[in-house]
Design a protein with these regions (language model features):
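A periodicity- and composition-biased signal for non-globular, repetitive helical segments
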Residues: 18, 27-28
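Compositionally biased, intrinsically disordered low-complexity segments enriched in Pro/Arg/Gln/His
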Residues: 6, 11-14, 20-23, 36-38, ...
Length: 306
C-alpha cells in the first residue's frame, strides 16, 4: 500500500511555551506544510450553496417531467427555484426530499465543448442541487448529498452519505510511534505546529487531554449534517464517493473510491484527484494532487503536496 508522506517540523524545545526553532525535520506517515490557518478553531469554509426560495412543482412542470421519462416517489416532496426549467431533465428518478436550482446556462465539459446544464439518467434521493449543474449518467445513485452551483458530475456510480460519517475527521493515528498508542488526531485545522505539539508532548496527560477535548469540540461544532460538494466542482468517471466533503473548485477524474474524506480545495488552490486513487479516512489540503492510483488511508496531506 502506498502512503502519502508529510514532513512535520518538530520544535526543539523543552517547554511548550518556548517559541519553536524550525531547524530539524522528522519524517512520519503524514506529510504537511505549514498551514495558513491561524489556530485550531478556524472554521472550514464549506461550499457556498446559493440560498434561494423554493416552491412546489406546478402541474405543467410535473407533466413535462413525466413526458421526459422522469418519475418521483412523491412529486410533492420536490421543491424547485422560481426559474426552474423541467425540460432539461430526462430519465431521472426522484426519491425523498429534493431541492433543485435553476438550469439556465451552458457548462463547459471540455475545452470548447459546451453542454446545457440539467440532469439526465440519474437516481436522486434526499439531494439538493444548486444552479446550472450538469449531472448525467449516474449508474447507481446520489443519496443524501448537497451539491453547489456550476458543478459537473458525469459517469459516476454512487455518491452517498451514510450514518456515522466522519468525513475523515477525528481519526487517531500513530506518528513516530508506530507500535504504540495513537498520538495524533486528524482534523481540518491540523497544522505542523499542532501536530508537533501532540506528538512531542504525548506523555503530558493534562495537555494531551485538553488538546483532544478542544479538537473533539471543534469537530462536533463544524461537522455537516450530510456530505456536501462545493461550487464549480467537476467529478467524472469515478466509481464511489461516500461520506466525503468536497470544497470549491475541486476536480476528481477517474478515482476508484473516496470514503470518509475532506478535500479542502478552493478557487486559489484547487485539489485534483486522479485515476485509480483510493482514499479513505483522510484529509487533503488545498492545492494538493493525488494521482497515479495512489492508495491512501488515515492520512493528512498538507497544502500543495503532490
Amino acid at each position: 500500500m502506498t502512503y502519502a508522506y508529510l514532513n512535520i517540523t518538530t520544535p526543539q524545545h523543552n517547554n511548550i511555551f518556548t517559541p519553536p526553532q524550525h531547524n530539524n525535520t522528522s519524517t512520519s506517515y503524514l506529510t504537511t506544510s505549514t498551514s495558513h490557518h491561524n489556530n485550531i478553531f478556524t472554521t472550514p469554509q464549506h461550499n457556498n450553496i446559493t440560498h434561494m426560495i423554493y416552491r412546489k412543482l406546478t402541474e405543467d412542470e410535473i407533466s413535462t417531467l413525466q413526458a421526459n421519462s422522469c418519475w418521483a416517489e412523491d412529486w410533492q416532496r420536490i421543491e424547485v427555484s422560481e426559474d426552474f426549467e423541467p425540460r432539461f431533465f430526462h430519465r431521472v428518478m426522484f426519491y425523498g426530499d429534493i431541492r433543485l436550482g435553476a438550469f439556465t446556462d451552458n457548462v463547459e465539459v471540455s475545452r470548447g465543448f459546451m453542454k446545457h446544464s440539467g440532469v439526465n439518467n440519474a437516481t436522486l434521493r434526499n439531494v439538493t442541487i444548486g444552479n446550472n449543474c450538469l449531472i448525467e449518467n449516474i449508474s447507481g445513485y446520489i443519496n443524501n448529498y448537497t451539491i453547489g452551483d456550476d458543478c459537473i458530475i458525469s459517469n459516476v456510480c454512487t455518491m452517498e452519505t451514510t450514518d456515522g460519517a466522519t468525513y475523515g475527521e477525528g481519526n487517531l493515528i500513530s506518528v513516530l510511534n508506530e507500535v504504540g498508542e495513537g498520538n495524533l488526531i486528524l482534523f481540518h485545522g491540523l497544522t505542523s505546529q499542532v501536530a508537533a505539539l501532540m506528538v512531542k508532548h504525548f506523555h503530558n496527560r493534562p495537555l494531551k487531554d485538553t488538546i483532544r477535548r478542544l479538537i473533539r469540540e471543534e469537530i462536533e461544532r463544524t461537522a455537516p449534517d450530510m456530505a456536501a460538494i462545493g461550487n464549480r466542482v467537476k467529478i467524472v468517471n469515478t466509481k464511489e464517493i461516500t461520506n466525503t466533503v468536497i470544497y470549491d473548485d475541486c476536480e476528481i477524474a477517474g478515482a476508484a473510491r473516496l470514503s470518509d474524506c475532506t478535500l479542502m480545495s478552493n478557487s486559489n488552490a484547487s485539489v485534483y484527484i486522479g485515476t485509480g486513487v483510493i482514499c479513505e479516512n483522510s484529509i487533503i489540503g488545498d492545492g494538493s494532487s493525488i494521482i497515479n492510483s495512489v492508495k491512501m488511508q488515515d492520512c493528512f496531506v498538507g497544502e500543495a503536496c503532490k
